[in-house]
Amino acid sequence: MDNGTATLERVEDTLQLGSRLGEQLRAGDVVVLTGPLGAGKTVLAKGIAAAMDVDGPVTSPTFVLARVHPARQAGKPALVHVDVYRLLDQHGADLLGELDSLDLDTDLQDAVVVVEWGEGLVERLAQRHLDIRLERVMHSDVRIATWEWVRTTGDDAECSAEEERCR
């Protein structure tokens, strides 16, 4: 999966981008969605879920922290949709500890984990992650999305194009 940028003029564009990215994700992948309130993070997660063909409606899990969406097909990964917005004010929040305390019905290594508001916290979940940033164009409904695989170990260097998904 290459790094990239897209202009998203409609909600459908955001869903399509999520679907395109979701088709390439596999078990053990971690995706971080970053952007201001209303930028389209949950809409993008819906597109990822649609491509992965998982059960259940994808809604913002803000008040429950995480939702597990099982795969409809055997052998395919589940989607764990996490929203850590309410943890942002807690200095030193332990995302992994919070997820462990939820007793999720799936092993995170067997799922694709999509984390809204996870910047600065997700590094404890994986050695690398797909960083997707959504920004709103002022006085417009247009969003700009950028995405790249980022290594979260060592010197925190971004993945080079030659490295297959930072592995």
Model-derived features with residue positions:
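Conserved lysine of the Walker
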Residues: 41
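Short beta-strand-centered segment that lines the nucleotide-binding/catalytic pocket of NTP-utilizing
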Residues: 54-69
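Hydrophobic anchor at the beta1->P-loop junction of P-loop NTPases
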Residues: 31-33
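Short phosphate-coordinating micro-motif centered on Lys-Gly-acidic
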Residues: 2-5, 90-167
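N-terminal pre-Walker A segment at the start of P-loop NTPase domains
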Residues: 1-20
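Phosphate-binding P-loop
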Residues: 23-28
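P-loop (Walker A) phosphate-binding loop of NTP-binding proteins
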Residues: 36
